[in-house]
From Swiss-Prot:
GO molecular function, one term: ATP binding
UniProt subcellular location: Cell membrane
Free-text function comment from the UniProt entry: Produces ATP from ADP in the presence of a proton gradient across the membrane. The gamma chain is believed to be important in regulating ATPase activity and the flow of protons through the CF(0) complex.
UniProt source species: Geobacillus kaustophilus (strain HTA426)
A Pfam family this chain is assigned to: ATP-synt
Keywords: ATP synthesis, Cell membrane, CF(1), Hydrogen ion transport, Ion transport, Membrane, Transport
The protein, known as: ATP synthase gamma chain
Main localization of the protein described in the UniProt heading: membrane
Length: 285
């Protein structure tokens, strides 16, 4: 049985851990509130640019563009959004597991795919498995701006435009609520889903439709990446908040259990001392 000193040491250590996890929970809650607002604020912009792009692409004249048309697939790109830090429950492991299983199922050779990764956790995961990472970015702020992601987004879209990739998929955690995040797979390029937009507005084009699409489509694809990043950041903070809350609750439960054990051990020690004193007194009589 553990000594009173050992139990007391464990209680003090667990209390310190509880204080740390509680502080991290509060920090994550604050970050989540702002990240959630950022993600929600970006939705109207995305809805409007999607409407405009769809109308330009599918309007009168039916202009075609390489970013809108499916082509034979020789190489696939995977854009994976993870975090730079851990302590976020299954936030990273869920999305990485899905990507890894998908790649193993679809491809027989590393020559058939390449990975663009956002976040140190994902970068470490793929490098340890010798999987081809063609682009990466780490150390993004907790509340990233479009400027923070613009360069890698531009390069990612460029890899499809120059024929390096024939299709591009994006994997991230979609924010549903503070207690629910869903791993999401989205086909980023080609933009074949624009045909699903039923709303139509007639535009007069100046310059030509094709020239407008040359500018609009890359911007739209880059905006999709940024929108997914905002979504993923909200999910990250929510997952970390939940993980730290669970850790705090578990620590407090352990403290209660250890305190009970400490009191029982202390009571047993006192009882033993009293018994020995009484026995000694009786022996003297």
């Amino acid at each position: 049985m553990a000594s009173l000193r050992d139990i007391k040491t464990r209680i003090n250590a667990t209390k310190k851990t509880s204080q740390i996890t509680k502080a991290m929970e509060m920090v994550s809650t604050s970050k989540l509130n702002r990240a959630e607002q950022n993600a929600k604020s970006f939705v109207p912009y995305m809805e409007k640019i999607q409407e405009v792009v769809a109308n330009v692409a599918l309007g009168a004249g039916g202009a075609s563009h390489p970013m809108l048309v499916s082509r034979p697939v020789k190489k696939t790109g995977y854009l994976v959004i993870t975090s730079d830090r851990g302590l976020a429950g299954a936030y990273n492991s869920n999305v990485l597991r899905l990507v890894y299983q998908t790649i193993q199922k679809r491809h027989a050779s590393p020559d058939e795919y390449a990975i663009i990764v956002i976040g140190r956790v994902g970068l470490s995961f793929f490098r340890k498995r010798n999987m081809p990472v063609i682009l990466d970015i780490t150390r993004l702020p907790d509340q990233p701006s479009f400027a923070d992601i613009k360069e890698i987004a531009r390069k990612t879209v460029g890899l499809f435009a120059d024929g390096t990739f024939d299709e591009l998929y994006m994997y991230y955690n979609h924010y549903v609520s503070a207690i629910q995040q869903e791993v999401t797979e989205r086909k980023l390029l080609p933009l074949t889903d624009l045909a699903e937009n039923k709303q139509r507005t007639v535009y007069e084009f100046e310059p030509s439709q094709e020239e407008i699409l040359d500018v609009l489509l890359p911007q739209y694809a880059e905006s999709l990446i940024y929108g997914a990043l905002l979504d993923a950041k909200a999910s990250e903070h929510a997952a970390r908040m939940t993980a730290m809350k669970n850790a705090t609750d578990n620590a407090n439960e352990l403290i209660r259990t250890l305190t009970l054990s400490y009191n029982r051990a202390r009571q047993a020690a006192i009882t033993q001392e009293i018994t020995e004193i009484v026995a000694g007194a009786n022996a003297l009589q």
